[in-house]
Amino acid sequence: MRVSKYLLSTQKETPANAEVISHQLMLRAGMIRRNASGLYSWLPSGLRVLRKVEAIVREEMNKAGAIEILMPLVQPADLWIETGRWEKFGPELLRFQDRHNRDFVLGPTHEEVITDLVRKEVSSYKQLPLSLYQIQTKFRDEVRPRFGVMRAREFLMKDAYSFHLDQGTMDETYQAMFTAYNNIFTRMGLAFRPVLADTGSIGGSLSHEFHVLANSGEDLIAYSTGSDYAANIEKAEAAIPTQSRLAPSQAMSTIDTPNAKTIAELVEQFDLSITSTVKTLIVKGATEEQPLIALVIRGDHELNEVKADKIDLVASPLEFASEAEIRAAIGAGPGSIGPVGLNIPVFIDHSVSVMSDFAAGANQDDKHFIGINWERDLPLATAADIRNVVEGEATPDGLGTYAMARGIEVGHIFQLGTNYSKAMNATVLDENGKSQVMLMGCYGVGVSRIVAAAIEQNHDDRGIMLPEALAPFTVGILPMNMHKSHRVADIAEKLYQDLNDAGIEVLLDDRKERPGVMFADMELIGLPHVVVIGDRNIDAGVFEYKNRRTGEKQDIPLDQIVDFLKSSLKA
């Protein structure tokens, strides 16, 4: 491709409304342009990267035995009503009516459509297992789209769905998809990590997320220093303490704490160790008989709302009680609540169950208890894992300690079970002629999001440094003053043709531009290999080669450049 025949819409200035580096660089490099909040057009350079992501995903899905189909973006509301998600999904589901006043949605996901399709097309166990996938636009009406295509309202996604008669083939397909996802991100040249994940609103049992590692990532990943165990922070399990609870060494007493509304203030004012304090959080209960539930964690820990949400007595989704509700039930404000003498159900984190001589609110305003001990001052409450893990603590497999990293979720696989197939009566006849509800798996890749995530991981202060597998072009040719030098023009043209003939994607900058502008554009859009041609190089019988990622420069003989580039690409 010649730049003179190409739409290379680069910008010098960083857009003021772009928060993250990938959004800034995608705009500056002319990859995308904003049409409205969360809606973007893909320009040629961006689309070339997007298509490369698609191609790798498609190849690995095909290798995994999945069959490509295409389902509509617009979906009838009847299917969503059938599964109950018409009411549950929330305002992110864009609903509308056609001219006949029939309800439709813009699909944020396709579980309903695929289940409807398969229940009509598949009737016998002999047709299973079956894996189908598509690469299709999705729409979620995000309340505040952010970070460019990282969290847009309209986005491109690969979603695959598998159907099974038994758990054995479900497990086999899940493992095949797990392997395919590892292959996808490895081929793209990305640093990534698969982690155990919560199934969230989609439901199901087993689930893994795939995260591109980046300091700017919104998701916190906890992984073991001594094994392959890894999970997102919502799913990461805290090991149950192995130590015994120490015997009491002091009596429980009350202290006045008028200026201690938080754990930090309590610790500072009374010279307490934060690990000898607990905080008690009041949430809504699941039943009218038990409208409030107390959750108790150590003072230096954070409540894990996803874990707490799974307690049967806790209302789902988890909702904190208001100050008025807390005062009406307990007689004190949130900053003075503790587990002693509470007349509502109490759940404690496992780490709290081994504490002794600890401090907590006294359920009176401006008062706290110190020297609290289980089974002496209050009955030992039901213990559960309800906190976030912290760096350095033991992992549940006992093979290491937790370390933390930031990541951007780009893939998610689920074992859905019968959540959708049962609701939609998606059944087949087994070998005995008996009707059986199909098991389902769901496997998503954020195709457009990968582009942004790859840039978050691969950039410097001069621009984008995409891996070769994703770069819009592999080689850039920069001829210096080619419009004044016939030698430079001729050699540049020959190299351009030779690289094209070799099947190498090449961008020839044939503009009448200053060298500084040409260099800046090539670095901004992130071409992995750049070849500079000038009269001085020709006199010396060499091309100047520069590697975008390493910054390494080499002089390569004129007659060896194509072979050199071929060998560099193979490496």
Swiss-Prot record:
Pfam families: HGTP_anticodon, tRNA-synt_2b, tRNA_edit. Keywords: Aminoacyl-tRNA synthetase, ATP-binding, Cytoplasm, Ligase, Nucleotide-binding, Protein biosynthesis. One of its GO terms (molecular function) is ATP binding. Its EC number is 6.1.1.15. Its main location: cytoplasm. One of its GO terms (cellular component) is cytosol. GO terms for biological process: prolyl-tRNA aminoacylation. It catalyses: tRNA(Pro) + L-proline + ATP = L-prolyl-tRNA(Pro) + AMP + diphosphate. It is found in: Cytoplasm. InterPro entries: aa-tRNA-synt_IIb, aa-tRNA-synth_II, aa-tRNA-synth_II/BPL/LPL, Anticodon-bd, Anticodon-bd_dom_sf, Pro-tRNA-ligase_IIa, Pro-tRNA-synth_IIa_bac-type, Pro-tRNA-Synthase_IIa_type1. It comes from the Bacteria. It is an enzyme of class 6 (ligase). NCBIfam families: PRK09194.1 (NF006625), proS_fam_II (TIGR00409). Homodimer. Belongs to the class-II aminoacyl-tRNA synthetase family. ProS type 1 subfamily. Catalyzes the attachment of proline to tRNA(Pro) in a two-step reaction: proline is first activated by ATP to form Pro-AMP and then transferred to the acceptor end of tRNA(Pro). As ProRS can inadvertently accommodate and process non-cognate amino acids such as alanine and cysteine, to avoid such errors it has two additional distinct editing activities against alanine. One activity is designated as 'pretransfer' editing and involves the tRNA(Pro)-independent hydrolysis of activated Ala-AMP. Consists of three domains: the N-terminal catalytic domain, the editing domain and the C-terminal anticodon-binding domain. This is Proline--tRNA ligase. It comes from Shewanella denitrificans (strain OS217 / ATCC BAA-1090 / DSM 15013). The gene is proS.
